[in-house]
Structures are given as C-alpha cells and as structure tokens.
C-alpha cells in the first residue's frame, strides 16, 4: 500500500470488519458446539469450516491496519446461542448484512479514499459471505423440511468418521462399518461419480 490509511474512514471500516469477522468466528464455534449437542455433526462441521474462513477474512483486514489505537463506533450481534435452527437463521442474516450492505459500502469508501487494493478485498470477501449465507439457508431449509437425514430419493451418505458410503433415501441409524451414530453421516451428491460433498 502506498499511502497511509491512518485517520481515514477506511481505517475505521477495516477495524469494524476485523472485529465483526472475529466475533463471527467465535459465534460459529459456539453454534458448532450446539449443533453437535443436537446430533447434527455435518452442520457443526459447516459452522467450524466457516469459522476458519472468517478467521482468514479477519486476518486479511487486520493486515491492512497500521497499528496504534483507533476508536470506532459500531453495532454487533449481542445474541444468544439458540437451537441449531435459530443459529442457522442468525448466521445467515449476519452474512447477508455483510455482503449486501456493509462490505459494498466499505469498498465504495475505500475507492473514494484511493485504496483500490482494500476495495477489492472488501468486494471479494463479500462474494464469500454471499456463499456462506446460501449454505446456511440451505441447511436451515433442510432442517425445516425434515431432510437432514432423509431425502426424497436415494442418495449417497458418507460417514464422517470412517468414510463408509451408504446408498439410500435415509441415513442409517449408525454407520454399518464403524457403528458411529447417524449424526456422523452426511449426504453427498446423488451421483456416485460426483465426488463433491454437498453443502
């Protein structure tokens, strides 16, 4: 970066974003623990994976900062740890605010202040947050439809513990290979040739 961000709105926006991403990471780890308690290992895994991605976003924003103390005024979710459905809805709403409102505005300010690289970072991270929202909303829809462990057609279910793959409309109560509980099974694509895990 060529010019200093000290004293700019971009500096404040970076610190707000760093704080927001750091808090999201913590919330998602709390939500993962709750999902695991409720028997949703796959959803817990998605929360943990997303938490790690939020850490990387926080790191990206933090690295643009130049040190010292910066005072900011910002609002952050002061919510509770609900059940997994509530947590998915809250997470999706938070991701939506980031990609639809906050980061586009922060990118605009960065461009106006001459920080093109920072503007690009805000825009790129916003695209990731949009994907996070989609994933959370899909998981929530699956829960609402009672389709976390049961589908309308036969699909492949993979054990997160041992890798065993089972084909059927419903995940078995326990893995036939290692006997881990149903909570450890996640669905994969309906096509056996598609090795991508569905989200």
Please place each PLM-identified region on the residue numbering.
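Short functional micro-motifs and their immediate structural scaffolds
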Residues: 167, 180-184
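Conserved alpha-helical segments that form or flank metal/cofactor-binding pockets of metalloenzymes
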Residues: 37, 42-74, 135-143
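Short cysteine-rich clusters marking metal-coordination/redox-active sites
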Residues: 159, 175-178
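A broadly conserved sequence feature marking short terminus-proximal activation segments
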Residues: 105-165
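Alpha-helical transition-metal enzyme core signature, strongest for iron centers
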Residues: 20-28, 47-62, 92-99, 122-136
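Conserved small/polar residues in nucleotide/adenosyl-binding loops
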Residues: 187-192
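Acidic/His metal-coordination segments adjacent to aromatic residues that form catalytic metal sites
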Residues: 2-13, 73-94
